[in-house]
Amino acid sequence: LSLHIRAGEIYGFIGHNGAGKTTTLKAAVGILPFDEGNITINGRSIQTEPLACKRELAYIPDNPDLYEFMSGIRYLNFIADIFGVSAADRQARIRDYAARFELTDDLAQPIAAYSHGMKQKLAIIAAWLHRPRLVIMDEPFVGLDPKASHLLKGMMRELCDQGGAIFFSTHVLEVAEKLCDKVAIIKGGRLIRSGTMEEVKGDDSLEQVFLELEDETC
């Protein structure tokens, strides 16, 4: 498996359940160890310089495991403290993102009282707080309502327009086809096709190509 995600790119990662998407993403952010190969972020190895790498990235898992005993605002301040975000910057960013996701009135409530969608919104806000260069997300649209999904897509493109990069897995092929600059298809931990959307799908739909590749490699 060899991928190169460049600044300015939204890179989609697709495959059926159990294909290895989550394992790959967890290895990329330093959660899971690996025996061979190397993962570098902005020229630094996640194995030899994990802290330097983690300062430049944000990770949203498929089921965000938040500190439910905290309130939303306490959790966001906790994350901001970890990344050294100044008081002025965090206040402005929290105010902005919470307003976008209509979460402002809920930040004082304990996270334990949040719905799945609200937790997902909070995780997204937390990920964007320190202005990461790379955001890695596992099925980020699951649980989001249409408005929040639209907002997230805009934030992803905005980050890339500012020189960042996005790497995310999804089962929603229509979203990947419309949103991604590049896409990689994985099966059994092995890359079976990657490239720009035009290179991967040609004149067909991404769904059609994905299903054909699945059949060919069975």
How should each PLM-predicted stretch be described?
Residues 77, 81, 88-106:
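Conserved ABC ATPase "signature" region
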Residues 110-114:
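Conserved ABC ATPase signature
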Residues 194-195:
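ABC ATPase "signature
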Residues 135-139:
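Catalytic Walker B motif of ABC-type/P-loop ATPase nucleotide-binding domains
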Residues 149-162:
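Helical segment within the ABC ATPase nucleotide-binding domain
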Residues 37-48, 52-53:
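Conserved ABC transporter NBD signature motif
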